[in-house]
Amino acid sequence: RSTLFPYTTLFRSQPLDVGSGKTVVAGLVAAEVAQADFQTAIMAPTEILATQHAKTLDELLSPFGVSVALLTGRVKGAQRRQLLDNLANGDINVVVGTHALIQEKVAYHKLGFVVIDEQHRFGVKQRQALLQKADHMPHLLSMTATPIPRSLALTLYGELDISILDELPAGRQPIVTKIWSPASAPKLYETIDHELAQGRQAYVICPLIDDNPDNDKKSVEAEYHKLAKTMFRHRQVGLLHGKLPPEEKAAVMQQFADGELDMLVSTTVVEVGVNVPNATVMLIENADHFGLSQLHQLRGRVGRGQHQSFCHLMLSGHDKPSQRLREIEKSQDGFYLAEVDLKLRGPGEIYGRAQHGALSLKIASLSDTPLIARAQTEAERFVKEGRDLLQYNHLARAVSRYQRLTILN
C-alpha cells in the first residue's frame, strides 16, 4: 500500500512461478485502489483466462463491496451498453477483459490501476492504448507466470520495480514428474486410466495439430482419434487446438473445466488457461521437443487441487533423456529451471528473437547476476544525480532503441 499511495506512480513487473497466486495479488491491490475511489482494468490475452480472472476476483472482492465486471467480445447488445455506462460513471470498480478493454467506445470514470497479464502476449500499441484510457498516468502491474532468470529480469525490466513470487499456496502437493519411453506407453495408459477411474481428469499435449510426414512428432488430431477410439474409448475425450473457431475452443475448455470431459487432447494452447483443480494428470508427448520453460508451464496446469498430481514426459524415441528433461524431472522450482534454460539455450531463445539484439551484452554475461544488479544500481545513481545521457551519443541511441523494445507506456 505504501508503494501505491499517495502520489508515486507504480511501474512494477511481477514474474511468478506457475500456480503461485498472481490473480490474488492483483485483486488485493485493486481493493486498495477501489478504496481510494479509482478503478482497475485487468487485461488478459484470452477470453477463457479473462473469465477465470473475473470469477476469482468477484469471489474475492464482492464481500467487501468491490464490484467486478467482465468485458469481452461476447458481451453484446443491451448488456454491453449497460456495462459501458456503469464503467463510465464509476459504478464498476474492477473490469476484467480482453482486447475489448481498449476499444474506442470504452471509457473509464477514474482509471487508476492497470494490470496486464502475460504482457508479452500483447503488442506495444495495445498496452499503450489501455494506459491512455486514464486521465493521468495510472499505476501499472505487468504480470507473467513465466519464470525468468533474475539476471534476465534485471536486464529486460530494469526500468520497472520487480516483485518475484516463488512460493506456492499452502497445502499444494509437489507434482510427481516421470520420464517414459514409447515402449512403456501401455503401462502409462493404465496408470492414467486408474486416475480417471477415481474421478480425476487428464491433459494430453501434442506438439503438432496435423500429421507431418517430415518428422515424427505426434499430431493432436491423430492422437485424439487414437485415444478416443482405443485405450480410452470408455471415457469422454475432448479435442483442443488453435485452428478451432474461438467459440468452439471456449466451449471445449469450459466442458473440461466443468468436469464433462475426462481427458483433453490438446496442443500447447492450454499453456496459459483456466484453473481446473480436478485435473491431476499431464501427459506431454514428444517432451524432448519442448523447451524447459514450456514444459514447466504445461506441468503447472495440474497440481492445483487437493489430490496428488502427475506429469508424464513421453520421449519421441529410445534415446537417453536430455539434460533438460532430467532437470525438470528432479526440480519444480521454475526460477531454478529458468536459470538452467538460460545456460542451455541463451537469452535470445528464452525471450524471443525480437529481443535478441537488446540482450547481446558487450561486456557482461547474463549469467553474471551480481554484476548486472550493480550496473542497474549505478545507472539509477547516474539518473538521480541529474547526469545528461545525451553527452554519450552512442549510449543514448542504444538506450532509446532498447526502450522501444521493452517499455510498456
Please place each PLM-identified region on the residue numbering.
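Single conserved hydrophobic/aromatic residue that forms the stacking wall/gate
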Residues: R1-T9
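Inter-lobe coupling/hinge segments of SF2-like helicase ATPases
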Residues: F11-R326, E385, L390, N409
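C-terminal accessory region of SF2 helicases/translocases
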Residues: Q306, F310, H318-N409
